[in-house]
């Protein structure tokens, strides 16, 4: 008989559910990015929509997702189950895809985007909570990293698939959108057969995520973060405008998804070093560098001529995303009292979600009225104001 008394402890492995959730995220991202990589040009070229309408559609869609996130985690805790909301969220995402292929007007595209983003907002919080539910605390970092890595694979694969499908289907964007149904339904089937419908009881009774009475307990430092987040969001309008700019500078329709490929490649390569920079020197440095990168990106996109300048600007846009994504959420967590953290995130997501709508609408109107340079000049101006506020206020530890 073997003596195992002194054997080293067995290292915990990432649960099967986390792998399934990662694959679900990957397939849905492939489905969504196939559509998103071409949608701005489908609206303007095929449907003859104004750029202002593109901004309105994207702004409403993204703000809807942000606002839905405020309440989805609470509902998940309230009903005591994660799977129903996860399934509903991914189901709405998959069901929206046929509407893009059938759309004969901007109104139907608007409805499809609204349904798709409601689904994204509903599934995000319960999905992340389920990862925590099934994973031992000592490997949760690895578990979240795995899910995010598979999600990133989808963000690359979707635009690349769109390029291949455009060549195969002779630039028929409706046919490409129809193909996006396949990975979307694959994601839904994986949720149905691969995720257990286990109950999840929080340690304390779930609280409404946004309570007016809690706002009095949030101090000036927190509201400064909200103000900076709002100003930063005004500078961060939809990536649809990057696709439109590249097309205006001569990028062929079939290669339009290359914009998101380049942006996501730079973003993914820079995210880990940016995290190391934040760990080593605090959150302020990467935020300032990210804002400087965004200003430089806007300068290239607003004043540069030709595709080389445009793609350099797109790469800088990816740099700013790598440096800034997650930093503001970190600041919200730091500046809000622990007992009010849920309400603090609710306020922040609500404020930035509504601001995203205003930012994208303004960007679209400026594009139609004064041309692409005005859109990117305005974005650069908001980024410069945000950089000034960060550099001169004691909001973020240096």
Each predicted region: which residue ranges?
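Helix-to-loop junctions at the C-terminal end of transmembrane segments
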Residues: 68-80, 166, 270-282, 367
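Cytoplasmic membrane-interface "Motif A"-like loop-to-helix N-cap segments
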Residues: 78-90, 280-291
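C-terminal ends and interior cores of transmembrane alpha-helices
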Residues: 91-104, 292-305
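Juxtamembrane intracellular "pre-TM" segments in multi-pass secondary transporters
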Residues: 2-16, 197-228
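Transmembrane alpha-helix termini and helix-breaking/packing motifs in multi-pass membrane transporters
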Residues: 41-46, 157-177, 358-374
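Symmetry-related core transmembrane helices of the 12-TM Major Facilitator Superfamily/SLC fold
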Residues: 174-192, 374-391
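Cytoplasmic helix-loop-helix junction between adjacent transmembrane helices
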Residues: 112-153
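Helix-loop boundary and gating motifs at the non-cytosolic
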Residues: 8-62, 222-259
């Amino acid at each position: 008989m073997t003596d195992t008394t002194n054997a080293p402890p067995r290292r915990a492995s990432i649960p099967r559910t986390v792998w399934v959730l990662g694959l679900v995220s990957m397939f849905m991202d492939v489905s969504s990015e196939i559509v998103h990589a071409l949608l701005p040009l489908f609206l303007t070229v095929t449907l003859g929509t104004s750029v202002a309408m593109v901004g309105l559609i994207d702004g409403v869609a993204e703000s809807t997702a942000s606002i839905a996130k405020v309440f989805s985690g609470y509902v998940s805790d309230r009903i005591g189950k994660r799977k129903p909301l996860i399934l509903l969220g991914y189901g709405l995402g998959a069901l929206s895809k046929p509407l893009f292929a059938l759309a004969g007007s901007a109104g139907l595209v608007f409805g499809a985007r609204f349904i798709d983003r409601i689904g994204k907002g509903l599934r995000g919080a319960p999905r992340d909570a389920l990862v925590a539910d099934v994973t031992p605390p000592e490997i949760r970092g690895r578990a979240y990293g795995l899910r995010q890595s598979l999600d990133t694979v989808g963000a690359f694969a979707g635009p690349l698939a769109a390029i291949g499908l455009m060549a195969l289907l002779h630039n028929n964007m409706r046919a490409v959108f129809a193909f996006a149904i396949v990975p979307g339904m694959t994601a839904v089937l994986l949720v149905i057969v691969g995720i257990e419908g286990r109950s999840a009881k929080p340690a304390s009774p779930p609280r409404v995520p946004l309570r007016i009475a809690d706002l009095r307990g949030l101090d000036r430092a927190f509201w400064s973060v909200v103000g900076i987040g709002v100003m930063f969001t005004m500078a961060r309008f939809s990536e649809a405008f990057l696709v439109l700019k590249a097309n205006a500078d001569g990028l062929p329709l079939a290669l339009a998804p290359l914009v998101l490929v380049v942006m996501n490649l730079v973003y993914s390569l820079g995210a880990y070093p940016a995290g190391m920079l934040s760990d080593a020197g605090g959150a302020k440095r990467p935020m300032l560098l990210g804002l400087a990168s965004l200003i430089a990106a806007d300068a290239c996109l607003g004043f540069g001529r030709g595709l080389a300048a445009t793609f350099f600007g797109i790469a800088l846009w990816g740099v700013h995303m790598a440096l800034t994504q997650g930093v503001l959420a970190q600041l919200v967590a730091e500046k809000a009292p622990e007992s009010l953290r849920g309400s603090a995130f609710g306020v922040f997501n609500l404020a930035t979600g509504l601001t995203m709508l205003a930012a994208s609408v303004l960007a679209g109107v400026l594009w139609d009225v004064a041309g692409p340079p005005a859109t990117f000049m305005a974005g650069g101006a908001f980024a410069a104001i945000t950089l000034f506020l960060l550099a001169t206020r004691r909001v973020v530890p240096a």
